[in-house]
């Protein structure tokens, strides 16, 4: 239970724990309309490769077997759409996001891609999911967990809503582990991304927060321990693109 005076980080700032969600909501309200474009620009398109790797790991059934995916912090629908296109007719995805602006963009994209019969959008909080116990075959979260104020609560909720045998997959920015690349990555992150955000979205501060939040996120081994503590078994991870991102996996057995 939260205590008076409890704090957490919002980028490099310490803020009251209860304030972080409101601050994060403001970030994504400001950038929702250009979020997908900025992902392409910031990563030179690599985010598409990383998300495709997530879907390869997910490996949804290609036949009519029913398969229910919960994509949390899925906003504009990238993961859910990729999974739907890779899966068979029994696939259904629920995109859950706390930000209605992101969900609105995602719903419009689903209609344009003729995927609205397979992908639905629900406003909700990762820490208190409004879904029944053991109701999903898989849970994905891509570039969202670091924005959650209470990560341990979100992980416990992920475990709760998964069926036995269900899989948890988390794609998140990580720690660059290639000498030389780390300095280039830091320079690009702090000197290029915020001005780029200002030029494309009119908002540099939101992207300053996003690059700072990456540096505050636990290293892969520490995050793996958090996943285990939530009850998951067979926890593994792989780093991609020299450690720019990590893909964590766990199972509810």
Curated annotation (Swiss-Prot):
Pathway: Quinol/quinone metabolism; menaquinone biosynthesis; menaquinol from 1,4-dihydroxy-2-naphthoate: step 2/2; Cofactor biosynthesis; ubiquinone biosynthesis
Reaction it catalyzes: a 2-demethylmenaquinol + S-adenosyl-L-methionine = a menaquinol + S-adenosyl-L-homocysteine + H(+); a 2-methoxy-6-(all-trans-polyprenyl)benzene-1,4-diol + S-adenosyl-L-methionine = a 5-methoxy-2-methyl-3-(all-trans-polyprenyl)benzene-1,4-diol + S-adenosyl-L-homocysteine + H(+)
EC number: 2.1.1.163, 2.1.1.201
UniProt cross-references to Pfam families, sorted A to Z: Ubie_methyltran
One of the record's GO molecular function terms: demethylmenaquinone methyltransferase activity
Chain residues that bind S-adenosyl-L-methionine: 76, 97, 125-126
Tagged with keyword Transport: no
Membership in a protein family: Belongs to the class I-like SAM-binding methyltransferase superfamily. MenG/UbiE family.
Protein name per the record: Ubiquinone/menaquinone biosynthesis C-methyltransferase UbiE
Organism for this UniProt entry: Nitrobacter hamburgensis (strain DSM 10229 / NCIMB 13809 / X14)
């Amino acid at each position: 239970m939260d205590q008076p005076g409890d704090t957490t980080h919002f980028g490099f700032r310490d803020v009251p724990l209860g304030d972080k969600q409101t601050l994060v909501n403001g970030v994504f309200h400001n950038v929702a309309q250009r979020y997908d474009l900025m992902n392409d620009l910031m990563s030179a398109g690599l985010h598409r490769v990383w998300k495709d790797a997530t879907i390869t790991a997910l490996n949804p059934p290609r036949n009519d077997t029913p398969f229910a995916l919960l994509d949390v912090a899925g906003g504009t629908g990238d993961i859910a759409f990729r999974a739907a296109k890779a899966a068979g007719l029994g696939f259904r995805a629920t995109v859950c996001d706390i930000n209605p602006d992101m969900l609105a963009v995602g719903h419009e994209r689903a209609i344009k891609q003729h995927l609205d019969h397979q992908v639905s959008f629900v406003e909700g909080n990762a820490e208190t999911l409004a879904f029944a116990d053991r109701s999903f075959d898989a849970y994905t979260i891509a570039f969202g967990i670091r924005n959650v104020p209470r990560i341990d609560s979100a992980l416990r909720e992920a475990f709760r809503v998964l069926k036995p045998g269900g899989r948890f997959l988390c794609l998140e920015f990580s720690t660059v582990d290639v000498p030389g690349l780390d300095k280039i990555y830091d320079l690009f992150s702090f000197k290029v991304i915020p001005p780029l955000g200002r030029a494309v979205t009119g908002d540099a501060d939101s992207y300053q927060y996003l690059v700072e939040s990456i540096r505050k996120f636990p290293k892969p081994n520490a995050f793996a321990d958090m996943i285990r503590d939530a009850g998951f078994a067979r926890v593994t991870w792989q780093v991609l693109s020299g450690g720019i991102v990590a893909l964590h996996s766990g199972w509810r057995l």
